[in-house]
Curated annotation (Swiss-Prot):
Gene3D superfamilies: 3.30.1360.40, Ribosome-recycling factor. Belongs to the RRF family. Responsible for the release of ribosomes from messenger RNA at the termination of protein biosynthesis. May increase the efficiency of translation by recycling ribosomes from one round of translation to another. This is Ribosome-recycling factor. SUPFAM superfamilies: Ribosome recycling factor, RRF (SSF55194). It is found in: Cytoplasm. CDD domains: RRF (cd00520). GO terms for biological process: cytoplasmic translational termination. GO terms for molecular function: ribosomal large subunit binding. Keywords: Cytoplasm, Protein biosynthesis. One of its GO terms (cellular component) is cytosol. PANTHER family: MITOCHONDRIAL RIBOSOME RECYCLING FACTOR PSEUDO 1, RIBOSOME RECYCLING FACTOR.
Length: 183
């Protein structure tokens, strides 16, 4: 629905951006099981710039508690190893030629609870972002030259989209929380 300056699809797109950002952040949280997404935030100093790990190596999960990083260029092995160590993921690389193996240690109960708190913090940041988008939409509706009925309808539609986005965020959080707490 587009009326003057108000576009519900633009608001949906911006809210989807907040959800995608949350999905990315949660993907970087370690759960005790190996997942390729754990290494997504790792940036490697390569060829004079910072590059995502997946642009200089192939990451695979040969075992449930093991990540394997196959570096394409032999000269980049040390840089990839350094990037993994500096990523604060708590992983210790074991290098064999061009293959770097990362054993995923068991998470203790205290660490699991810390990770759940971090996940909640990420989810709250996403909810705040969605609420900001809602506020922006409501501001546009108020400033638009709409009848009172149109303003009510637009405000209701904005609230529906907001509620759906927050429900999606809560679902993502619940899934990640269950994943973290499963021993």
């Amino acid at each position: 629905m587009t009326t003057n300056g108000f576009d519900i699809n633009d608001l949906k797109r911006r809210m989807d951006g907040a959800k995608e950002s949350l999905r990315y952040e949660l993907g970087g949280l370690r759960t005790g099981r190996a997942a390729i997404s754990m290494l997504e935030p790792v940036q490697v100093e390569a060829y004079g710039s910072h590059m995502p790990l997946n642009q200089v190596a192939t990451v695979s999960v040969p075992e449930p508690r093991l990540l394997s990083v196959q570096v394409w260029d032999k000269s980049m092995v040390k840089a990839v190893e350094t990037a993994i160590v500096n990523s604060n993921l708590g992983l210790n690389p074991a290098t064999e030629g061009q293959v770097i193996r990362l054993r995923i240690p068991e998470l203790n109960e205290e660490r699991r609870k810390e990770l759940v708190k971090v996940a909640h913090k990420y989810a709250e940041a996403a909810r705040v972002a969605v609420r900001h988008v809602r506020r922006d939409g409501l501001d546009i509706v108020k400033k638009d030259k709409m009848s009172e009925d149109e303003q009510e309808r637009a405000s209701g539609e904005i609230q529906k989209v907001t509620d759906a986005a927050i429900a999606d965020i809560d679902k993502l959080l619940a899934t990640k929380e269950k994943e973290i707490l499963t021993v």
